[in-house]
Swiss-Prot record:
It comes from the Archaea. ATP binds at residues 283-285, 299, 370-373. Homodimer. The tRNA molecule binds across the dimer. It comes from Saccharolobus islandicus (strain L.S.2.15 / Lassen #1) (Sulfolobus islandicus). Pfam families: Seryl_tRNA_N (PF02403), tRNA-synt_2b (PF00587). This is Serine--tRNA ligase.
């Protein structure tokens, strides 16, 4: 086992403890892992000594005869039994140690802000022209302090996306969906459905033009696999499990794509491998409590296009920058104003060494909301899934690095369009970049989405 965290455990456990402190996690986990690894190495020495003794004994037996031969054969059998018991003990300790190591989060990158929660996240970039209601200017300036941002003041108060969707456009119904399925479900109709499809087509069109292979992945994964992709103990309240089946619904195509090379080796000269996955995403949102109960911002199901890269360790930071650049290009083409946030250590999640969020300005809410999450997971997932690269020229093996980023999460992006592209009369302009994906369908909206006079249901 050659994961970097084991090397840290042996050479610099204090640095590993500091990593856990940065994440606001109990450092005693490191002490337990150190003790298990120490015990493992002690038992390994005993196993190797016993193997050597058994090999020496086995080599002597063919040269012997009579009672001495019988005596040595019996001695060999007894020694083999002791060896087998020690090997079982070694395996048991190794499993326990590796289970504990697998529960530890990734090593935080040096340039990640320190802090226990999202209040320590640091905005590092702003893009676009922000529409700000005159009553929200002070709050907007507070959220963009020390940044040179371009904004326009509007005198009318934009309506929230939930009100636009259900009460103005009459193109959605969450109340009926809640009646038959529970909260955080929805019915969407006509132009909003077309908008959903257009966003997905635009995202996969753009990302595949950047050299990514399009993937339609499995929507479910076995328990062993999903546990390797994410920290399932932490996220068990976020992932749906199929009753009486060892299957879990994916929360993003990242999960299935990450597992594409489960327990396999990849030739180093084939890296990087870049994929664009399109799939539904299923999320319990159990930890969301009473957040975003109205509308379609935080829901149990939505469509998503995901970027994913398998990389060599030396190139992974380059590809992390590429992923967020791709995401920025998508939202720039949509002309949705946003900021990029460097996520604090305590808000990262176990998988990521570093994460950027892209947050779009929502003028009705007077706040920035997350649309994209872009992570470098280094070798955390690869270690757990046993995905290695093979460098045959240098006779070397190592764990690949895995990286992921949202391209489009459809419902969230629709909320951003409804708030940023609405007019005072309730009409919503269709972003120009999406229009070519709609023009081929006679019933799809072309330039504008107009309010219906009556509700569909």
């Amino acid at each position: 086992m050659s994961w970097s965290i084991l090397e840290f455990l042996r050479k610099n456990p204090e640095e590993l403890k500091n990593n856990l402190k940065r994440r606001a996690i109990d450092v005693s986990l490191v002490d337990k892992a150190v003790e298990l690894d120490k015990k493992w190495r002690q038992v390994l020495q005993e196993v190797e000594r016993l193997r050597h003794q058994h090999n020496v004994l086995s080599s002597q037996i063919p040269k012997l005869s009579g009672e001495e031969r019988k005596k040595k054969i019996e001695e060999s059998k007894n020694l083999l039994k002791i060896l087998e018991d020690k090997e079982k003990e070694l395996e048991k300790i190794e499993v326990e140690r590796d289970r504990l190591l697998s529960s530890l989060p990734n090593l935080v990158a040096d340039d990640v802000p320190n802090g226990p929660d999202d209040s320590y996240n640091i905005p590092i970039k702003f893009w676009g022209k922000f529409k700000v209601y005159e009553g929200d200017v002070e709050e907007f300036l507070r959220q963009t302090k020390d940044a040179n941002v371009n904004y326009e003041i509007i005198k009318w108060k934009p309506k929230g996306h939930a009100e636009m969707l259900e009460d103005v456009l009459h193109l959605g119904n969450t109340l009926k969906a809640a009646e038959i399925a529970g909260s955080r479900f929805y019915y969407l109709f006509n132009d909003i459905v077309w908008l959903d499809f257009a966003l997905l087509l635009f995202a996969i069109d753009y990302i595949t033009q950047q050299g990514y292979t399009l993937v339609l992945p499995p929507y479910m994964l076995r328990g062993e696999v999903i546990q390797s992709v994410i920290d399932l103990d932490t996220f068990k309240d976020a992932i749906y499990k199929i009753e009486n089946e060892d299957l879990y619904l994916i929360a993003t195509a990242e999960h299935s794509i990450a597992a594409m090379f489960f327990k396999e080796e990849i030739e180093k000269d084939k890296l990087p491998l870049k994929f664009a996955g399109i799939s539904p995403a299923f999320r319990k949102e159990a930890g969301a409590a009473n957040k975003d109960l109205k509308g379609i911002f935080r829901v149990h199901q939505f469509h998503k296009v995901e970027q994913f890269i398998f990389s060599t360790p030396e190139d992974s930071w380059k590809y992390h920058a590429e992923l967020i650049t791709n995401a920025e290009s998508i939202f720039q083409q949509l002309e949705l104003p946003y900021r990029i946030v460097n996520i604090a250590s305590g808000d990262l999640g176990a998988c990521a060494a570093k994460k950027f969020d892209l947050e779009v300005w929502m003028p009705a809410q007077a706040k920035f909301r997350e649309m994209v999450s872009c992570s470098n997971c280094t070798d955390w997932q690869a270690f757990r899934m046993k995905i290695r690269y093979v460098d045959r020229k240098n006779n070397k093996r190592g764990y690949v690095h895995t990286l992921n980023s949202t391209a489009i999460a459809s419902t969230r992006t629709i909320t951003a369009i409804l708030e940023n592209y609405q007019r005072e009369d309730g009409v919503v302009e269709v972003p120009k970049v999406l229009r070519k994906y709609l023009e081929i369908f006679p019933k799809a909206p072309k330039d504008y989405i107009y309010p219906l006079k009556n509700k569909i249901i």
